[in-house]
Regions:
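Glycine/charged-rich beta-loop-alpha catalytic/anionic-binding loops adjacent to active sites
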Residues: 56-57, 113-117, 220-222, 238, ...
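Structured adenosyl-cofactor binding patch, chiefly the S-adenosyl-L-methionine
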Residues: 233-275
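Short amphipathic, helix-prone segments within low-complexity/disordered or flexible regions
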Residues: 2-18
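Short, ordered loop/turn segments at secondary-structure junctions
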Residues: 49, 106, 148-151, 252
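N-terminal positively charged helical leader segments and presequences
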Residues: 3-5, 20-108
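RNA substrate-binding interface of SAM-dependent RNA methyltransferases
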Residues: 110-197
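Active-site/ligand-binding-proximal alpha/beta "capping" segment
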Residues: 198-237, 246-248
Length: 275
């Protein structure tokens, strides 16, 4: 017969084996969940707290989007995410007015490695919406409108811009919804030194090229885009004297504000993740 010491050793060994098996099973389950969640094309953002045992209730617009736009059917899978968790759900039933989702699994949304703030002058509605949409897809963390000397679009529908940002994140498989702040003055932006560096886009082709700069994703970066008609001479002087501020060129061509924002964001994201 086994002694008490041998029994204790065997029990301890069994506990270690169970712990190792449970750990690997948990990791495998996470990998499988991540793979399936990435493959699910139907994605909906719900701006409220959801518990894993809750019933997810969608509003009329979201149901219409799932059924009529994405053509979601019974037994299809839908990714539902809020600001904290990502849920893999299965459609139990869907009609024009109702949608019943069963929660299959969930995971915590990890914070993004980068932090990029886009400072921009509000422009006309259509190009502004394009800028918000594309920069949300690419990865802007915070949109900060700035009232500049040549700003000619001061009335902005921020609720619509937030909706556009949400839809862009749903489409692009991004789980972090960017913030869209209320406008600040140019002077307030100049006096802000909370970020590691500020890159203002200049029409001077002799300025620094972003691709030649040393940028890392663990540093908070600000991109400053001028209004239609560019920064004024006085604003250029303020930008040049601003702490941690560097002028950058986006090439020899004169880009529209929304094009400059999208281009600068793309170059910086590629630089910090792929360089």
């Amino acid at each position: 017969m086994a002694t008490l010491a041998e029994k204790n050793q065997r029990a301890a060994l069994d506990a270690i084996i169970v712990n190792i098996f449970s750990t690997y099973l948990y990791k495998i389950n996470n990998v499988i969940t991540n793979i399936y969640m990435k493959k699910i094309k139907n994605r909906i953002f719900v701006d409220k707290k959801i518990n894993s045992n809750d019933q997810i209730i969608l509003d009329a617009d979201q149901i219409h989007y799932l059924k009529s736009v994405l053509r979601t059917k019974k037994n299809d899978y839908v990714s539902v995410f809020n600001r904290e968790l990502l849920f893999m759900t299965k459609v139990i039933d869907i009609t024009k007015k109702t949608c019943e989702l069963e929660i299959i699994d969930h995971k915590k949304i990890e914070s993004e490695d980068h932090n990029i703030t886009l400072f921009f002058s509000p422009i006309k509605r259509t190009p502004l919406e394009i800028m918000i949409q594309k920069c949300s897809e690419i990865g802007i963390s915070i949109f900060q409108p700035v009232i500049m000397e040549r700003t000619n679009m001061k009335n902005v529908n921020f609720e619509r811009l937030r909706l556009i940002a949400v839809e862009a994140c749903e489409q692009s498989n991004r789980n972090k919804i960017p913030e869209i702040n209320k406008p600040i003055s140019f002077a307030t932006m100049i006096n802000d030194n909370s970020l590691a560096g500020y890159l203002y886009c200049s029409l001077d082709n002799n300025e620094e090229k972003i691709k030649n700069m040393k940028l890392t994703k663990n540093e908070a970066i600000g991109i400053i885009i001028g209004p239609e008609g560019d920064f004024s001479a006085k604003e250029y002087e303020s930008l040049k004297s601003k702490k941690k501020s560097i002028g950058v060129t986006l090439g020899p061509n004169i880009l529209k504000s929304e094009t400059a924002a999208i281009t600068a964001t793309s170059i910086i994201m590629d630089k910090i993740y792929n360089a």
